Curated annotation (Swiss-Prot):
UniProt KW Oxidoreductase keyword: yes
Region feature (Disordered): 1-65, 402-484
EC number: 1.-.-.-
SUPFAM superfamilies (alphabetical): GroES-like, NAD(P)-binding Rossmann-fold domains
Top enzyme class: oxidoreductase
Keyword terms: Oxidoreductase
Signal peptide positions on this chain: none
GO MF terms held by the record: oxidoreductase activity; zinc ion binding
The keyword rRNA-binding appears for this protein: no
Record GO cellular component, one term: mitochondrial outer membrane
The protein, known as: Synaptic vesicle membrane protein VAT-1 homolog
Compositional bias annotation for Basic and acidic residues: 411-484
Length: 484
């Protein structure tokens, strides 16, 4: 990629400049001015000359188009829940710098990093307000100066640090890759982040070879499915994959040799049963205590590759306890331990490779070749409209997806909007019913607690009455003894 660290921010800055420069030109159209006073012949001549001088130049004729140019964008307005990502309309045509292209976006990819970014846990996303999204696919609509290898009409997939969740993006041409023949826009949007991540971890770090074993966590997710497919391009690789039981059939068909239900089984024990000596490669997106477990599962010459901290994510808003717990349990190892164990630990973060054009190009070229050969193919879980981004994020965060979740820039049809509004109303009604049930249960529980307290009071009174009766009996006995 180029050295442009934040093309999305530059784009927003250009839009702001355009709006600022347009304001003086637009204001005369909206202002109402008083009738001019009578003018002399010389004044009229001067006015005529001024009017001639003010005749719009050809460049100014573009202003109406730029004024009417609008596009929709998802904007992270602040850190928090799903409602913090809002669909907004931007005005003004983004300006192209030398070496840049404008892409009309068709599809966008949703990644786990986007969920973390929404909670303020992903440091490669600029501060809000900002448009998230690291990948998209679309058609080149305009080309800047010094761009020789791209042209208007080219179908491309785009990998960028941020700013991809909108209908129009401006990026360095080096951030774009031509789509192979037969690739859909959905597949193109699903490919860059997941497949480059999986490829570089397995082959650049892991040096995956025949007859080796790999542990893939979150095997039903985007990176998990990409990693599994890439493992199957090497002969006799054994893949252990963690996923909930309902996803085992799909991931087994995709190439996972030994699916493990992490919710009901200890994956460490399951791996040890099948591979007592351990594993050659562990891909760890979880962090915390799971990194310790992964390291201990390595056989001699094994490699642990850490590429995330998904354990920090608990709920749609930042959970400080989960963050603190994961951070506290974060893995650290002494070099002496590495030497004695003959193991290695690697860290991978695609977001910090955005200026490493050659590395990214090599990985993308290899992945594209494998796609053309039919050896890898993104699995699309579901597609949501930009208006439904909250539902899309919820599906991923609740781990309900099997494969990639895609956002389409195609506007929702009126019937779909009505259906969506109906669903929202049903959700609200369901929530009200749930809240009412909870309130009723609380009231019922409170009544039961009060009834129990009353029962205890009655029992206590009975006990005290018994004690009093006993004391009275004892006194009577004492009186009788004294009388005798």
């Amino acid at each position: 990629m180029s050295g442009e660290d934040a093309p999305a921010q530059q784009q927003n800055a250009e839009e702001q400049k355009q709006q600022e420069t347009k304001t003086p030109a637009e204001s005369p159209k909206t202002e109402s001015k008083p009738d001019p006073p009578p003018t002399s012949a010389s004044t009229e001549a001067a006015a005529t000359a001024a009017a001639a001088a003010d005749t719009p130049a050809p460049a100014a004729e573009k202003a109406p188009e730029e004024d009417t140019f609008t596009y929709r964008a998802l904007v992270l307005t602040g850190y928090g829940g799903y409602d913090k990502v809002k669909l907004q309309v931007k005005k003004g045509k983004p300006a192209l710098k030398s070496g840049e292209v404008m892409v009309r976006v068709k599809m966008c990819g949703l990644n786990f990093a986007d969920l973390m970014a929404r909670q303020g846990l992903y440091d490669r996303l600029p501060s809000p307000p900002v448009t998230p999204g690291m990948e998209c696919s679309g058609v080149i609509e305009a080309v800047g100066e010094e761009v020789t290898d791209r042209k208007v009409g080219d179908k491309v997939l785009v990998l960028n640090r941020s700013g991809m969740w909108q209908e129009v993006v401006v990026v360095a041409s080096t951030h774009t890759f031509l789509m192979p023949e037969g690739m859909s826009f959905e597949e193109a949007a699903a490919l860059p982040v997941n497949y480059i991540t999986a490829y570089m971890m397995l082959f650049d770090f892991g040096h995956l070879r025949p007859n080796q074993s790999v542990l893939v966590h979150m095997a039903a997710g985007g990176v998990g499915i990409a990693a599994t497919q890439l493992c199957k391009t090497v002969n006799d690789v054994t893949v252990f994959g963690t996923a909930s039981a309902s996803k085992h059939e799909v991931i087994s068909q995709g190439g996972v040799t030994h699916p493990i239900d992490y919710r009901t089984r200890d994956y460490v024990e399951e791996v040890r049963k099948i591979s007592p000596k351990g594993l050659d490669i562990v891909l760890d997106p979880l962090g915390g205590s799971d990194t310790h477990k992964g390291y201990n599962l390595l056989k001699p010459m094994g490699k642990l590759i850490s590429y995330g901290a998904a354990n920090m994510l608990a709920g749609q808003k930042k959970n400080l306890f989960a963050v603190a717990k994961t951070w506290y349990q974060q893995f650290s190892v002494h070099t002496l331990s590495l030497i004695q164990g003959n193991r290695s630990v690697c860290g991978f973060h695609l977001g910090y490779l955005d200026s490493e054009t050659e590395l990214i190009d090599q990985a993308m070229t290899a992945v594209m070749d494998l796609y053309r050969q039919g050896k890898v193919k993104p699995r699309i879980d579901s597609t949501y409209h930009l208006e439904q981004v909250g539902d899309a994020m919820r599906r991923m965060q609740e781990r309900n997806n099997i494969g990639k979740i895609i956002l389409t820039t195609e506007p929702m049809k009126e019937e779909e909007k009505k259906e969506e509004a109906k669903k929202d109303e049903e959700k609200k009604d369901d929530k009200k019913k749930d809240d009412k049930k909870k309130d009723d249960k609380k009231k019922e529980d409170k009544k039961k607690d009060e009834a129990k307290k009353e029962e205890k009071k009655d029992e206590k009174k009975k006990e005290e009455a018994k004690k009093d009766d006993k004391k009275a009996e004892e006194k009577k006995e004492e009186v009788k003894k004294e009388e005798n």
